[in-house]
Amino acid sequence: MKRHITTALLSAILLTAAAQQKETSAVFKLPPLPYQYDELEPYISRTTVKLHYDTHTRGYLDKANKILRKDTPDSISQNLAEIVRNSEGALYNNAAQAWNHIFYFDAFSPHAITEPGGKLMQQIEQQWGSFQNFKNTFAEAATGLFGSGWLWLVKQPDGQLAIIAESNAGKVLKSKSVPLLGIDVWEHAYYLDYQNRRAEHIDALWNIIDWRVVQKRFAGIPRP
């Protein structure tokens, strides 16, 4: 009898431990940045990069993971972009913000090529006249976005480029366009470094946006 109770108790402990492990294990893990926290200085400070990525981005991903484990276990086999495309409400908001931020940070480099080339540059010049005109239009859209949100350069199904401003997490992955570049214009992205000077922040980003990354996205590298 004593042995039977011990076996039952051990089974219960193992089941509890397995349940706890499932509850605490991450569905999606935050990838490491492709550079050190301080390598984007002086354009984005170490403090902002660390807070923005390790706290804000991780927070969105942790919340999305919690919802997935609890409410939609069948979605665990999907990648994060598919979760974004197929979700709504709180799961969408957190998964989209996590994906947006990872995409955003991945386009930066301390050794950035600060102008596009090849077919992407040709398309920009065809539509905006020059790369400088494109940058001016992009910056105007960023500073003109009311409140918090995202600014996107996208490739539309017809091959044309478009600058899209969206509030909150936006819905770029729910569209038929391919995102090439995303800029976070929530205040947490720049307030520690630039206070309310959003335009100055956008202007600084041109120094660290790596157009090699954007060109790969434009060239048809599989959609994220």
Model-derived features: where do they sit?
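Feature for soluble, non-membrane regions of globular proteins
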Residues: 20-224
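Bacterial Sec-dependent N-terminal signal peptides
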Residues: 1-22
